[in-house]
């Protein structure tokens, strides 16, 4: 784990990504999260294991380039996002959708 997120592991994971592809990956015990763009794989692993009490077997990350956005005559950039696909050990699962 890097020094940046020591003691602040809850700040690493922003939100789960619920897309068609991510939903299909749930069947393979893979969960997709939007994470802080400065987080390294050890940070993400430690955060998921601590927050959800599961065992992580692997992580794949994607850091796509920022996209430009125009509003009238003003140009800007969208916030930088980093996606992480987390593979869990057999028998581990994360409850993303609460049962009611």
UniProtKB/Swiss-Prot annotation:
The keyword Ribosomal protein applies. Disulfide bonds: none annotated. GO terms for biological process: translation. InterPro entries: Nucleotide-bd_a/b_plait_sf (IPR012677), Ribosomal_uL23-like (IPR013025), Ribosomal_uL23/eL15/eS24_sf (IPR012678), Ribosomal_uL23_CS (IPR001014). Pfam families: Ribosomal_L23. Gene3D superfamilies: 3.30.70.330. The keyword Isomerase does not apply. GO terms for molecular function: rRNA binding; structural constituent of ribosome. GO terms for cellular component: ribonucleoprotein complex; ribosome. Keywords: Ribonucleoprotein, Ribosomal protein, RNA-binding, rRNA-binding. One of the early assembly proteins it binds 23S rRNA. One of the proteins that surrounds the polypeptide exit tunnel on the outside of the ribosome. Forms the main docking site for trigger factor binding to the ribosome. Part of the 50S ribosomal subunit. Contacts protein L29, and trigger factor when it is bound to the ribosome. Belongs to the universal ribosomal protein uL23 family. This is Large ribosomal subunit protein uL23. It comes from Synechococcus sp. (strain WH7803). The lineage of its organism: Bacteria, Bacillati, Cyanobacteriota, Cyanophyceae, Synechococcales.
């Amino acid at each position: 784990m890097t020094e940046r997120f020591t003691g602040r592991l809850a700040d690493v994971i922003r939100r789960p990504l619920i897309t068609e592809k991510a939903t299909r990956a749930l069947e393979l015990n893979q969960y997709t999260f939007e994470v802080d763009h400065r987080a390294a794989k050890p940070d993400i692993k430690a955060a998921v294991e601590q927050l959800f009490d599961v065992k992580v077997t692997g992580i794949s990350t994607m850091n796509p380039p920022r996209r430009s956005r125009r509003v009238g005559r003003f140009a800007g950039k969208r916030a930088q996002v980093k996606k992480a696909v987390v593979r869990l050990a057999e028998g581990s699962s994360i409850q993303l959708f609460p049962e009611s």
